[in-house]
Amino acid sequence: MSLLKKLASLAPAHPSHGDVERREIAAPTLVGNAEYLKLVDVHWNSSQQIMGLDSKTVGPQERCKILMYHLNEIVSVLAEEKEECPGPCLKYVLDENIFEIVFMWGTSSYVNELMKREQIKVFRNLIERSKAPILIYEQVWKPLLCLLHSCASTKLPSDMEEDYVAVLKGLCVSANRDIVLLDLFFLENHNHSEISGFSVFSLLIPYVHREGDLGVWARDAMLLSMALSSIDARLGSYIVEETNFCPILAIGLSGLFSDLPTSLDIPSEDWYSLERGLWATFPELVAFLTSLEFCNNVIQIAHHKVQHMLLELIYHGFLVSVMSSALTQSSVEALTAVTAYLDLFVRSITDSKLMQVFVKFLLVEKSDGVPILDSLVARIGQESQLAVVSLGLIHTLLDLNCEDILYTLVLKYLIPCTHILSSQRRTVREVDYYSKSAAKFLSLIPSCCHGLSTCLASSRPESPSCLSSTESLNKSIEVKIDMKTSHDFVKYRPQPHVHGGEATLADYLEYLADARQAIRNCQLRCSCWSMQYDGTDLSSTDDATENNPANKRRSLVLANGSIPRSASEVSSTLAVKASDKTKRSLSSNDLCLPSAEEGLGPFLSTLFRKLENMAQNTFYVNLILTAVITRLCYYPQPLLKSFLLNYNIVLKPGVRSLFQILSSIKIKVENVVESVEGLHKLLRRARNNLILREEKSKASIQSVVADVPIPTRESIASPTTQKRLARQKTDTFLAVRIRDGPPPSLMRAHSIGSIGSASTSSSLSLTDSIESLGNLSPQFGSTADISEDASPVSQAPETTGRPRASAVVRESQTQLKRNTFRRKNPKAVKNAVYCIVMLEEWLKELAAISQEHALLPLVPQEMQDV
């Protein structure tokens, strides 16, 4: 009994794993291996005496605690031992077979479960702290495998799972450092029948969809295993043939998708997409995206067998069976939610193979006999939030720079050149070196903007025509191309003699720089396309494509900034399958178009029909609509570029060009606002509201995500903020301002807490504007007083004669008529005002894109390489 008391006094009353981790050997620096070896010997002898005691002498739990104390001290010594093969302390542990003896004693004791828990902690401490490759020795890995096997056969308590998964992750880390461990822990390459058919990888599968740290550790460990499978094909074959890893991932996606809310409570009409970082408060969406991101990472690094099986299961088990039916629902709210989810999923994918699966699903699969992509295009023409969300998804798809998508939407209808006269085919490849199209775009800026625009020099006449305004702008901008820049963008610099228009001239130069960057990036990612789409003869093109192996390269998906390094990176099995069904068969059937959409196809026809109503559309509909058209303008393919940006091309009767539609819009908005008093003040306040909306949107995001207070009125009016927000560009609104707006509050049949409130709304209502006139806002609301603060009431001067009095009466009647029109048509006036503001900026952007398309072929090829 005296020995037991002595040993018990050495152990803490309640040792914990945290205490073990913080415990260090308090030994002087000069203590040699002999002293450490002596210390290990003392602890092991004490342990043997504890295990040899009768159970009646001391309780089993007390014996377990004392034994684990000594074992942890031995592990601490091993962790401090230098990397030798093996060191004296490790050699002593191996010779004594300490770990196996302790394991066997634990299985025969009355505290088997407690011993399992404590041994798992010991092995976690050993794996995480050991510097030597201790796991390669059978005296260590055999008892560890036996311990893991015994844990796998029973349900683990929750307080034990953390250490258990940590041990499994540590084994995956160690196997990546030493490939020898792959045979021992993953491939069952040992001769012990009691643990045959056992692999560490299979133990991780039940934790793949867990939340919290357990799920993170398990997924990280599996990714390490995937990296090993890419090195050793045996592991890849084992995962595919012997485990249910891939089916669990695919089924998990379907199950998590079914948990997503079926409707979105949209607080404002400026919303059209779900953004990363703003959906973090919704656990269902976070869980699905976590699983999707894990599948994406697995496909990136796993063995090709694992990739193929997982992709097939995701396509058939999730997309075809679940997503397809979700996209054919009858409820508009449900369709809006599913479309927004799909948009978010596509934007979250970074692996090209997984993106190919999603693109194939959109191009090949049908709902009610109609391809899913065609259904999305048809929804664009609706007057609902579904149309806006569908436009957002289309914009995301266009950002992929995918040949098959653009071919299906646009190019297959433009290839026959039925939209232009036969004599105009040569103009498809012409380059607008003299910027005639850019000048035409600028000439379409509404005349009411000329008084406010700062793009003209101060010497400009008071009432210039559209053409003279364009000429003045073109003369004011002198562009220098700095050819000395290597691997950089061409730099544009205004001449120092510009004075009155410096601010907006710099603004236009920024449009040019942004357009150049966007066009160059798009051109780089389209460089591997199989055709140039320049309007050449189809038969010769087909022959050249068949005979030239280089032209067989495909770019089904080059997503999220990926640039092809070789043809093998671009080609894929999906490209071949999608080719048979969607593209590459330019037969007579492909070229027979419906008469109603002759030459353009349903996508461009729907876009143009919606664009024709720009004066009546809401601000946010116009925002995403113009962004989609702008994204189409970035593509360098001559067929599409000439149709959208070439003013000189002659179209067939019945086919309207973008210039004709913009000219019609200009006339419409000018007709609406010609009777509006104080129009210039309304335009100024519309611009200010857009700047204020941007600042409030950013503050709302910060308050939701980081609990940052909304900026004050003074901070909004600061010079730095005003300079940063001076440009109201369509693409900037799209990429930053709208998408950074607050997310809709997700709701189920039973309510979930909504974050969409007045305090977090990114759009200004007519009553809560910080400006005194806050009566002109993109968001529809009460606009009854839109005209009163917007235009000051003119006071009639005193008159002494009848003619003067008659003039005053006529002036008063005209002003009364204008104010009456504004009071009776507040929605029309507001839409027209915001349409003018957007149209002016969009026309500048289109002009810049047109000029950059002409300039880019002049830049040396080495400057265009990444």
UniProtKB/Swiss-Prot annotation:
UniProt xrefs under InterPro entries: FHIP (IPR019384), FHIP_C (IPR045669), FHIP_KELAA_motif (IPR045668)
PANTHER family: FHIP FAMILY PROTEIN CG3558, RAI16 PROTEIN-RELATED
Pfam families: DUF5917, KELAA, RAI16-like
Chain ranges passing through the membrane: none
Region described as Disordered: spans on this chain: 739-761, 781-814
Biased composition annotated in UniProt, kind: Low complexity: 751-761
Family per similarity comment: Belongs to the FHIP family.
Name this polypeptide is given: FHIP family protein v1g243165
